[in-house]
Amino acid sequence: MNNLHLICNAHIDPVWLWEIEEGVAETLSTFRVAADFCDDYDGFIFCHNESMLYEWVEKNDPVLFGRIVRLVKEGKWHIMSGWYLQPDCNIPCGESFVRQILAGRYYFLEKFGVEPHTAINFDAFGHSRGLVQIMKKAGYDSYIFCRPEPDMLDLPSDTFNWVGFDGSKIACCRAYNSYESHRGEADEKIKGWMELHRGKKVGMVLWGIGDHGGGPSRIDLKKIEELKNSEKEFNLIHSTPEAFFEELAESGEKLPDYSGIMNPRYTGCYTTMMRTKQIHRKLENELYMTEKMSAHALMANVSDYPSEAIEKATKDLMLVEFHDILPGSAIEPVGEYAQEVAGHGLTELRPEKIKAFLALCSDKAKAEDGTIPVFVYNPHPYEVDETVEVEFQLPDQNKNPALYSVPHVYSGGVEIPCQREHEVSNFNVDWRIKTVFFAKLPAGTMSRFDIKMVLCENPQPPVQPEGDEFVWNNGKTKVIVNLKTGLIDEYEADGKVGLGKDSL
């Protein structure tokens, strides 16, 4: 008989149509029920992923956590995938995917002594091709996903080799008819797969109540057992993702190659909730900048490394990358929660970034009188051509309205092009200065630039007030602005009045 691997899971969205507190409670409830089923039913295997959820259990119910450790050792509970959570698989940068994998892998290896080699992202809305080489180099040889579905993306087969940009390959399976089954309907889902795949040597079906947790039910296990006893072509076995792919490889089935991305699905999610996407990218950039500067300062023996702050900020980043938070497909309170989580990460990083930055500046020469030193750090392992914006305070206010301060920027004693722009402040005194200059920043280096100020004659604007009005007239267009109200009193073009007094 041909084997059909039944993989029982309980997809738990930490947040979605509910908030994080409910996600924690549902995780505990689902894991308790699943542990009972593992003890009560011989041959049954429960599969679950996401180390963040296991951390919740470890913190809030140590006894249950101990049961799960025992069940994993007994082969009744399978640690699946081994990521921190199921993130959005399009928006994060490559390094963020690496962190999702490493955080989960380290946790499961430490707590359970396991290293899964099949990755899963059941509920993500698409998958970047760049994931292939990341997963391959992280120790994965296979991948299970559900979206995009067959009506959204035509693949050469539902089991295939996904080829990455660097030529890496991993075996993939697009799961049949989603990752879950409704209560009492798992057998119907299994029958549906068998009807479509008569003659197939090896197959896989995901089942279990999901989204808001749930997992197995007694009625489903009863019906599956009845189906198992009556089915003549397929041997139904409770199994794991790794067991399925191992048998698939041994079956001799030649898998076709696919070298594309796996998109699109729910494309509107990638054009909405911009606040979440913006603060995610800000946290992402601040985390990796702070981490690199801190590591540099440690190696230079000028500062220690802020491991605790980096770990906290990394977990905040990974949570914001959850596949219903970052795309913006959750309820409004979840969007507000994302701002809180990302804000916490930024708050953790800020003092550490300041500390590392100042430490890396500590060996720089003292500035000469009248010179304002500016330091710019390039965290990248390559030279960067960058437009640098900087604000600084003059030692004293320029109170002469006939003069204004002009910055001159020098790099290694050579003057480089720059320009003064309006500072963020609207404080109407020549005291706070913003300048912009173009710079070449060497890789992994703290670069120094020196600014010297020159007082220049303040040019007079060509148009002067006429009483209580500003009047611009070039012969074709005439505009009159009321100095008392700031409004346009008159607008005329080619002799035609567009706006008259009191129009606004």
Where are these regions (language model features)?
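Catalytic-domain carbohydrate-binding cleft regions of carbohydrate-active enzymes
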Residues: M1-P373, G412-I416, T435-S447, Y491, ...
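Catalytic cores of glycan-processing enzymes that make or break glycosidic bonds
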Residues: L6-C8, W18, M318, N398, ...
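A conserved amphipathic helix/loop scaffold
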Residues: G214-I219, N235-H238, R420-V429, P459-P465, ...
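Surface beta-strand/loop "capping" patches
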Residues: P351-V388, Q460-N474
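Beta-strand-rich interaction surfaces with strong enrichment in secreted/lumenal proteins
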Residues: Y377, V424-N426, V436-K440
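Surface-exposed beta-strand/loop patches in extracellular or lumenal glycoproteins
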Residues: H380-P407
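Beta-strand-rich N-terminal accessory domains
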Residues: E383, K452-L504
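Solvent-exposed beta-strand/loop surfaces of large extracellular or lumenal domains
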Residues: P401-K434
